Amino acid sequence: MDIQRIVLFAGLAIVSYLMVLAWNEDYHQPQTEQVAEAQSSSDSSATNSTDDMILPEDNNAGGEEFATPETGSLASTSANSDQDLADRFITVTTDVYELKIDRVGGNVVDSSLLQYDESLDSEQPLKLLTNTSTRTYLLESGLIGRDGPDGSQAGEAPVFQAETGSYQLAEGEDELTINLVYTTDSGVAITKRYHLARNSYQIDVSYLIDNRSESPWQGNFTGKIVRDQAPDPTSQASMGIRAYLGMVISTPEDPYEKYDFEDLSEKRVNQSVTNGWLAFLQHYFLTAWIPERDQKAQFQTTRRGDLHVMGFVYPATTVAPGETAEVGATAYVGPKIIDRLEALAPNLDRTVDFGWLFFISLPLFYILEWFYGLVGNWGVAIILLTVLVKAVFFHLSATSYRSMAKMRAVAPQLTRLKELYGDDRQRMSQEMMALYKREKINPLGGCLPILVQMPVFISLYWVLFESVQLRHAPFMLWIQDLSQMDPYFILPILMGASMFIQMSLNPTPPDPMQAKIMKLMPLIFTVFFLWFPAGLVLYWLVNNILSISQQWYITRKIEAETAGKKY
């Protein structure tokens, strides 16, 4: 019996340890409380900083750095100083996006995700990219280098022209293309093209260079993510645990390398990569750049004042007079949806970080998603998943409950042994083991199902915590977000009550101290579960109800079989 309780308590300790400590060590990054200094305006901040992206050595042997002006700069000889701000930004609307593109530089400075609310009680769409006086998060791209309009030593940015100030994906259309045009003083026509598709968070960015001048044109394509150091606005802490906030670089040699704000502040990345990607991650969402397949790129990080800049630069593209060329890359600005990310680039789906038990979490997620497709409710899908898991462990649980039922049946004999050999623990232990052997009882049998199901429990926690599909997912009545704690603590209380009923079916430990501890377990678990996601508490509650039914049936059966047996 002592061994059984030790294993049980050890198992419970493992649950606490793995669910809190592992997340804190591997995934939780302390979120800085210091937001980047407020800018008096996006225009004024743009003129005060330089963003230095080092060109690849093969076309910049001298190591010269070309300043790339940040989005928002109005310093351009081509710009109209009286241009209204309303005319400066181009609005692009699809079924999933509302984007704002700055004509100065042609960069995406704002993105609203139309299918995701800012918060549970808000009807405003979630903003991922933004450029305000207090927040900066941008998707930039440009042409730098010798002749690149974004790489002039004067720090000027090209001012693009567009056919209209508003583009919208029309009904019946599946694709939308936005062409921004700029002509250099030497006569080189540059078209910056954005291509978007229906039901897609993929943004294809390309430059078409038409060299109408008399000299060869040379420039380097670059893509960047620019972000301040503000905390994650979409983070939904659970048990004080927050999702990873920071940068990730993927290369064939190192498919998933993290750089948090501290790393980005202390060291500068500068490495040549082919077939890789870089991204900035926050809870449920990410922004990523994926260079073209088999295209060599120089991945870099740097600072722009208080802002972090992470990006890449292609080797130089040379366009002879009278010739044309096209160069570009793919961006992703949106939710962490495994299937979409998996199709976009190798290892990009790993940004949905299910932890070291991913080999359990991933199948659980796909099964849960399949159930949701059948019933259309994530809460009901969790219940069906619980039934399935219970069915998988049915025989193991039955063996455990039979062992506990037999322990309950021989409880009077155990009490008698304690009375006879209470002062001789060694003799008492020998007699107890002899009794277990005679009655074919496994003293560890009652703990085994709990230990075996722990990985499932922990994996489901990560599924609920990381899956954007469960963000703001309602169940019924007062449960409107399964990824967050029950606001009224009703589910944890019901779970505690079910655990109390289940404990009453177990044999009473002969040790009074153990008996008191076991009586307190439902209360301890209830308090522990108060801050768990409602979906996880729902899983545990349904599992308890199914376990009670199975255990009650087996206990009654064993008691009937041993009713006339004397010890």
UniProtKB/Swiss-Prot annotation:
Alphabetized UniProt keyword annotations: Cell inner membrane, Cell membrane, Chaperone, Membrane, Protein transport, Transmembrane, Transmembrane helix, Transport
Main localisation, per the record? membrane
GO:BP terms for this protein? Answer: protein insertion into membrane; protein transport
Q: CDD domains this protein is in?
A: 5TM_YidC_Alb3, EcYidC-like_peri
Q: Would you name any one GO CC term?
A: plasma membrane
Entry's transmembrane regions: 3-23, 354-374, 378-398, 445-465, 485-505, 522-542
Family that this chain belongs to: Belongs to the OXA1/ALB3/YidC family. Type 1 subfamily.
Q: What does this protein do?
A: Required for the insertion and/or proper folding and/or complex formation of integral membrane proteins into the membrane. Involved in integration of membrane proteins that insert both dependently and independently of the Sec translocase complex, as well as at least some lipoproteins. Aids folding of multispanning membrane proteins.
UniProt name for this protein: Membrane protein insertase YidC
- Which organism encodes this protein? Marinobacter nauticus (strain ATCC 700491 / DSM 11845 / VT8) (Marinobacter aquaeolei)
Name of the gene encoding the protein in the UniProt record: yidC
